Structure formats: C-alpha cells, structure tokens
Amino acid sequence: DSIKISFFYFRYGVFVIAIVTLLNQDDKFVEYFFYCIFFCFTVLVLDGYFQYFNGANILGLGYGSRITSFFGDEKILGSYISRLWPVFFALSTLMLKKNKILFFLFILIFILSETLIFLSGDRAAFFFINLSSIFVILFTKKLFKLRFIILILSILLIVVVSFINPTAKYRVLDYTLKQMNLTDKNKREQEGLFIFSKQHTHHYITAYKMFLDNKILGVGVKNFRNFCSDEKYKSGRYSCSSHPHNSYIQILAETGIIGFLFLILILFVFCKFIYTHALFKMRKKAYFNDFEICLLSGIAMYLWPFIPTGNFFNNCLNIIMLLNLPFLV
C-alpha cells in the first residue's frame, strides 16, 4: 500500500506544471486565481468570526473548544488560513498596489485573519503565521514596513481580545507551557519536561524506535499508524496516532535515511538560497524580489523542523504548499 501511495505522488508534479502552463498561456489567470483565493479566504475569515460571536457559523455548525468554521469537526481553520496566507499576501501586493482604497481593505482582512488564527487556538498555525511575518520583515526590500505594521496591529488586537476573552490565550500560551511541564514544579520533578506535550513526546519516541529498526527505508509511507501499537515500539499510553505529528520525524520513521536525506537536502538548498539573498541584501541588492520572498515564507513554514505538524503526506496540506511554487518558476 505504501508503494502505491508513493507512486501516485507524481500528481503533485503534474499539478505544478499545469499551473505554470496556465500562467504562461493566459495573462488573466493570475487575476482569476487571486480572486478565487480572495473569495475563499474572506468567506472563511468572516464565517470564523460569525461562529466566534454567535456560537455557530452561517450554516448552523457549532463549535466546542475551538473555532472551525466550515471545517466542522476538523480543527484545521487556523492551519488552512496560515498556510494560504503567504500566497494570498504575495498576490495581493501584486494585484492591488494601484488601488489604495481596496488595498487598505485587504490590510484589515489580513489583521482580522491573523487574529482569527489566534482565536482558533491552533498553536502551530499561530507560530507559522509569525514565522512567515518575521521572514518577510527580514528579507523584503519594500514590503517589510507594511508587514511589520500588520503584525503590530494584529498583536495589539490579540492583546485586547485576550483581556476580553482569555480562553484563546490559555489555549495558545498557558496550556502549552502546562503541557510541557513548565508551570508545575512537582510534575516536572516527577515526569521531567516534555517536547510540546506528553502525547507528542510519546509519538516521537515511538517513531524513533521504528527508525532504529528500519534505518534504510523506514516502515513505509503512512505506516506509522499500523506499527505504533507494536509492543517493541510503544513508549507509553500515547504512542499511537495516525502520524507522529512532526514532518522530519515522520519522514525518518516511514521512509528511513533515504527519505530523510532527501528532505534535509531540500532544507539545505532552501537555506543556501536565503543565505545568498541575505548577503545580497546587505549590499543593497536583491537575489529574490519581494513577491518571491512572500512565497518563500510559505515554503519556510513547511521546512521548519521544530514544531508539531500535520501528516506530511496529507493531500490538502501539500496542495496548499505547492501553490507557492508555480509563481516562483
């Protein structure tokens, strides 16, 4: 099964080539593509706030501890917005720079979207949107002021919201520290510190045991779920899950050294490009333009190693990430 799954990953290459072809053949495609993303993005943001204030979204879907909008039981609203943010921001700067009134409207949407990510309680998504912000602020030539202003205004709004309703703050900050055993000295002395949480720590140890037993090729793509209950891999009550919740650890466990080295090579090439751009920037030049840096900030999210992540082989997550590539080719 894992061989079949791996084989059909060529579809992502077809997806990128198809978009590149459309970009080259139709001058209006960028505009159509932008307004399509704009529609999806805006509807999600407005519906997310509607659900937050009313307890249910426009379709009547309620939420428990976290805002989900149209995603229902799937708590991926923050992840979806944060990952779509870089390509949307990049295209916005390209399409709306001549329309100042509309551009200020988009700034408002960006501020509201960043705040909504915080309200959704998705901690990884909140980290990613801030990582993208810092990336753009550090490496762009003209957009850094705009991105910095949006970030500051978003933080101010988040602070105000946290005072009015501290639930989101507890989920994103307080609960995170609690799960890592950083707030309870007695528990810390008894159990030690955890990597993000006890659940994550057990997943990571289990995945590492799988790697030690299958160093070259791993246990197979999407096979963590099938082997995590094996006694020789179990590391505690939270050993099992659909995936290890970290891309690099998942690749190590499921594809072994071969797959892991390929991912590290991609990370190395990416860092080399960014290092080259940084050198150019210090000389008042640019290796990448601001539009490309915005897109690269989206790729940086996927390559950042030290954060809990979704399934590396998740089709939806991969498609959103690949949306950045055609505009860089």
Describe the function of each predicted region.
Residues L108-I109, S242, N246, I274-P308, ...:
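Loop-to-helix entry and N-terminal half of a specific, functionally important transmembrane alpha helix
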Residues F53-G72, Y170-K185, L317:
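Extracytoplasmic catalytic-loop and juxtamembrane helix elements of membrane-embedded
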Residues D184-T255:
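Long extracytoplasmic/lumenal interhelical loops at the membrane interface
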Residues S120, T140-E191, H203-D213, V221:
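A membrane-periplasm/extracellular boundary helix in multi-pass inner-membrane enzymes
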Residues D1-F8, Y35:
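Membrane-anchoring hydrophobic segments
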Residues E254-T276:
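Selective detector of the "anchor" transmembrane alpha-helix that sits immediately C-terminal
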